[in-house]
């Protein structure tokens, strides 16, 4: 507990909010080539490279990620969820916030089933998260 004298000297400070997805907080004025402070829930971007990376210590896998240049000029690394994908260089994708816990530096997810990204094939459960259409009912 601070004394009155300490509060007079220093005062209290409000801790500033720090975004977990900072690239979604910036826009771009393309006419003036200046950054603007416009937040967005998703952003469009173009894949510059698609690769696999290995996760942090206790886990072992080859996680699919893409390097994406967004419409605001920022380049980020985004995770490609689901089994199998059709992304390659120059694919236009939609990204959303959301980190991948075991991949350092990956703070964004690619939205499946939007723009050039195909949905996951033969997906029965959690279809909306993976852009999969409802399967046609089997004929009797």
Curated annotation (Swiss-Prot):
Give yes or no: UniProt keyword rRNA-binding: yes
Q: Name one GO cellular component term.
A: small ribosomal subunit
Question: Which is one GO molecular function term here?
Answer: rRNA binding
Q: Which domain of life does the protein's organism represent?
A: Bacteria
Q: Which InterPro entries match?
A: NA-bd_OB-fold (IPR012340), Ribosomal_uS12 (IPR006032), Ribosomal_uS12_bac (IPR005679)
Q: Which UniProt keywords apply?
A: Methylation, Ribonucleoprotein, Ribosomal protein, RNA-binding, rRNA-binding, tRNA-binding
Q: Where is this region: Disordered?
A: 121-140
Xref: Pfam families = Ribosom_S12_S23
UniProt biased composition (Basic residues): 130-140
An example GO biological process term is:
translation
Residues with the modification 3-methylthioaspartic acid, per the entry, are 102
Role, per record: With S4 and S5 plays an important role in translational accuracy. Interacts with and stabilizes bases of the 16S rRNA that are involved in tRNA selection in the A site and with the mRNA backbone. Located at the interface of the 30S and 50S subunits, it traverses the body of the 30S subunit contacting proteins on the other side and probably holding the rRNA structure together. The combined cluster of proteins S8, S12 and S17 appears to hold together the shoulder and platform of the 30S subunit.
Q: Which family does it belong to?
A: Belongs to the universal ribosomal protein uS12 family.
Oligomer status and interactors:
Part of the 30S ribosomal subunit. Contacts proteins S8 and S17. May interact with IF1 in the 30S initiation complex.
What is the protein's given name? Small ribosomal subunit protein uS12
- Which species? Alkaliphilus oremlandii (strain OhILAs) (Clostridium oremlandii (strain OhILAs))
